[in-house]
C-alpha cells in the first residue's frame, strides 16, 4: 500500500483565490486545465503540481511562482550550513 505524505512545499493558492474576487476552485481548475479535485489536493499540500501547472497557476494570478509556492530552506534547520 502506498502512503501519501504531504509535500514540504507550501502554497498560497487559497489566499490568492480569495483575493481574486473569490475565485472558486472549479474556476481555477478550468483555467489551468485540471480537475477541481486536483486543485483541492494542491491547496491542501497533498499533491505537488507539475512545473507546467505551477506556472499556469502563477500566471492566472499574475504573480511570480515564488509568490504562489514556497519551499522551506533546509539550511535554516541545520544552523545555516548549506548541504
What are these regions (language model features)?
Residues 14, 40-41, 69:
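Key DNA-contacting residues within the recognition helix of helix-turn-helix
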Residues 22-41:
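Short alpha-helical DNA-recognition segment
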Residues 2, 59, 69-83:
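Short, charged recognition helix plus adjacent turn
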Residues 52-67:
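DNA major-groove recognition helix of helix-turn-helix/homeodomain DNA-binding modules
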Residues 18-19, 30, 59:
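Alpha-helical residues within the helix-turn-helix
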Residues 11, 22-23, 49-52:
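Residue-level signal for the short linker/turn that defines the boundary of a DNA-recognition helix
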Residues 1-21:
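A short, Lys/Arg-rich alpha-helix, primarily the initiator
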Amino acid at each position: 500500500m502506498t502512503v501519501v505524505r504531504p509535500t514540504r512545499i507550501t502554497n498560497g493558492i487559497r489566499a490568492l483565490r480569495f483575493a481574486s474576487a473569490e475565485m472558486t476552485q472549479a474556476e481555477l481548475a478550468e483555467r489551468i486545465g485540471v480537475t477541481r479535485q486536483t486543485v483541492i489536493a494542491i491547496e491542501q499540500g497533498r499533491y505537488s503540481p507539475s512545473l507546467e501547472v505551477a506556472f499556469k497557476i502563477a500566471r492566472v494570478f499574475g504573480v511570480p511562482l515564488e509568490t504562489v509556492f514556497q519551499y522551506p530552506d533546509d539550511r535554516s534547520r541545520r544552523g545555516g550550513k548549506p548541504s
